[in-house]
Amino acid sequence: MYFLLNLVGLIVIMAVVFLCSPQKKKIKWRPIITLIVLELLITWFMLGTKVGSWAIGKIGDFFTWLIACASDGIAFAFPSVMANETVDFFFSALLPIIFIVTFFDILTYFGILPWLIDKIGWVISKASRLPKLESFFSIQMMFLGNTEALAVIRQQLTVLSNNRLLTFGLMSMSSISGSIIGSYLSMVPATYVFTAIPLNCLNALIIANLLNPVHVPEDEDIIYTPPKEEKKDFFSTISNSMLVGMNMVIVILAMVIGYVALTSAVNGILGVFVHGLTIQTIFAYLFSPFAFLLGLPVHDAMYVAQLMGMKLATNEFVAMLDLKNNLKSLPPHTVAVATTFLTSFANFSTVGMIYGTYNSILDGEKSTVIGRNVWKLLVSGIAVSLLSAAIVGLFVW
């Protein structure tokens, strides 16, 4: 029964996004169907085969090694803290970001990461027959994050139509950054994090093409290659990366503290008017129909709906910390669906980040395309997360 409900949920999510599209007649269904089939194959391979499980295990081992290397550096600075059996969130999840950012920048410095993005993007473009730039951007998001991926293609953004600019804004809602993965792994199961990442990239293409279908003539389907800037020396690069990583840690820490405190304050105010009413309860009821359609029993659906609302209103870290404390009491399907949904940057603050990035890259008139379509960005981010969760849910019971 719950499997059929999960399958119906997949169809309902697509149908709701289709109804939200203002240009239904322009939608090209062949690329969308191709990508859905590709996603089902990827999910089956990663979750349903021994080779896929082995591959996820090896990727997980690699990130565990990265975190262990980062922990050595943290232990040098904070030996007494790292000697404890239980280490606080700041030390276990946030400080490793400094080293992981540096590591990914080293891969970029030597051309390894750009090569991977180029090859995978080419495969996606050929398989889906979608524009090259959009296909490459979906892969860039998987490694770099939304603002960084937008910065990489900033020269091309300046000459794109408003319609295509909106497409990149919609896709940016579902990004993730390779440097943050280690933090996720300290809170939720690696298997579902690594499965969610490629699904989010492909679903970002699907949802963007449903909400904002764009026709790109063949002569315009090109990727602008800017002239190579003078390369900084290696040690200047990694030193700058470490500072960038520390800045990310401070920003995330500030947001987590601020949002948790704000949630507590809002709950206190709500409790004055209605005894026991919390923002988590409100979100649980708002998102429960969608959570129920992911094949969850009523009790679990209410809890996952609460996590969905927390992620949208605050960020994925706050929601993952809550999920971490309840993992042992939840069945595998619920854990898989919840983890997959939470693995992305889709929330209100991300809209502000995307708008700010567009403002810094484009002139005032073009950058307003984001401000005029905030609701589409939110629909895109939520729909991509729901779609990824629904697909993973089909394979985990």
UniProtKB/Swiss-Prot annotation:
Cellular compartments per GO CC: plasma membrane
Keywords tagged on the record: Cell membrane, Membrane, Transmembrane, Transmembrane helix, Transport
Stated induction or repression of this protein's expression: Expression is regulated by the XptR regulon. Negatively regulated by hypoxanthine and guanine.
Coiled coil: none
InterPro entries membership: C_nuclsd_transpt, C_nuclsd_transpt_met_bac, CNT_C_dom, CNT_N_dom
Gene Ontology MF, one: nucleoside transmembrane transporter activity
Transmembrane portions of the chain: 1-21, 32-52, 62-82, 97-117, 133-153, 165-185, 187-207, 242-262, 282-302, 335-355, 377-397
Localization annotation: Cell membrane
Example GO BP: nucleoside transmembrane transport
Membrane topology: Multi-pass membrane protein
One Pfam family, short name: Nucleos_tra2_C
Family annotation (PANTHER family): PURINE NUCLEOSIDE TRANSPORT PROTEIN NUPG, SODIUM/NUCLEOSIDE COTRANSPORTER
Function: Involved in the uptake of the purine ribonucleosides inosine and guanosine.
Family assignment from sequence similarity: Belongs to the concentrative nucleoside transporter (CNT) (TC 2.A.41) family.
Protein's name according to its UniProt entry: Purine nucleoside transport protein NupG
Annotated source species: Bacillus subtilis (strain 168)
Gene designation: nupG
